[in-house]
């Protein structure tokens, strides 16, 4: 008679988890969830406080086309904010995107010029905004005789957001798999066609993320614009006319101490504009990702 086969266990028996590991996991989970809840609670508190203080003072007078000391209209500031944001992005986006394309797609690894450009970008991103404002005042306003104007402020803002968009674009391009490039080259496409037809569309969500951050910095900037664009309350008649953005308008109202309620109302509008821009950009990025 054949003896029944016995299973031979060659693997080692896993040791039961120690009690300290369970405690450490629980503590780590509590810390992670606690940090997330605190962050979300602070955000809700800030948004709720601004809305509660500002919504009751959103009157039709605040949206008059002409600013007076009585209505403290923010409509000229809204229009100036849109104009300055668009002009700054028109200047900054092509320069930053093409620079990032050169660094990732064309420059050789270990090139000293690439290292110098990245060092310059990191240095520019760490400079305080007041220094940018001082540079814009001395160069654009005084040296070029453009005075306090939309053009001076927009050029200063474009220099400020240039490192942000460039680094985001560079990271987005590096995230595109090399398989896409190799497949395009295998089909006979050149490098230029591959970059503009394959690489850039694949990296578009990351590029848009950098542009969103740049828009947020432009809309919320005050220090640099006070020195370059001025604080004029009327609508600018041209690129060489002075004007104030929403953030500068809110700063002026709050610093005077006479129109604090209108300053909170301006903060509500500024918050809604930023949320709307972020939502629209996120929807565009999601659509591009699906395509």
Residue ranges and their predicted role:
Residues 88-121, 134, 282-287:
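Transmembrane-helix boundary motif in ABC transporter permease subunits
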Residues 79, 83-91, 95, 99, ...:
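Hydrophobic alpha-helical transmembrane segments of multipass integral membrane proteins
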Residues 89, 168-169, 191-228:
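Transmembrane alpha-helices
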Residues 122-158:
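Generic hydrophobic transmembrane alpha-helix motif, especially the helices
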Residues 11, 15-34, 49-88, 110-111, ...:
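Periplasmic/extracellular loop-to-transmembrane helix junction in inner-membrane transport proteins
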Residues 128, 187-188, 201:
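Glycine/proline-centered hinge or cleavage motifs at structural transition points of membrane proteins
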Residues 70-72, 225-271:
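Interhelical loop and adjacent transmembrane-helix boundary motif
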Residues 103, 174, 212, 255-291:
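C-terminal transmembrane helix and the adjacent membrane-cytosol boundary/short C-terminal tail
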């Amino acid at each position: 008679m054949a003896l029944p086969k016995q299973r031979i266990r060659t693997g080692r028996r896993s040791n039961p988890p120690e009690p300290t590991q369970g405690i450490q996991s629980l503590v780590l989970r509590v810390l992670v969830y606690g940090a997330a809840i605190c962050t979300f609670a602070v955000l809700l508190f800030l948004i709720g406080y601004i809305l509660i203080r500002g919504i009751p003072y959103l009157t039709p007078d605040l949206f008059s086309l002409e600013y007076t000391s009585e209505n403290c209209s923010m409509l000229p500031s809204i229009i100036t904010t849109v104009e300055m944001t668009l002009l700054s992005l028109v200047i900054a986006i092509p320069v930053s995107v093409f620079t990032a394309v050169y660094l990732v797609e064309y420059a050789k690894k270990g090139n000293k010029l690439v290292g110098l450009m990245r060092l310059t970008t990191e240095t520019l991103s760490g400079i305080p905004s007041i220094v940018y404002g001082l540079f814009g005042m001395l160069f654009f306003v005084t040296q070029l005789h453009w005075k306090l104007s939309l053009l001076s402020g927009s050029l200063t803002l474009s220099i400020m957001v240039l490192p942000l968009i460039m680094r985001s674009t560079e990271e987005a391009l590096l995230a595109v798999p090399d398989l896409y490039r190799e497949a395009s080259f295998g089909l006979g496409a050149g490098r230029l066609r591959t970059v503009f037809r394959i690489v850039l569309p694949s990296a578009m969500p990351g590029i848009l993320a950098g542009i969103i951050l740049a828009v947020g910095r432009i809309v919320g900037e005050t220090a640099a614009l006070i020195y370059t664009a001025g604080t004029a309350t009327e609508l600018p008649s041209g690129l060489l006319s002075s004007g104030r953005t929403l953030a500068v308008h809110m700063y002026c109202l709050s610093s005077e101490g006479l129109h604090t309620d209108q300053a909170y109302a301006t903060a509500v509008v500024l918050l809604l504009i930023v949320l709307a821009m972020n939502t629209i950009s996120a929807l565009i990025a999601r659509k591009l990702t699906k395509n």
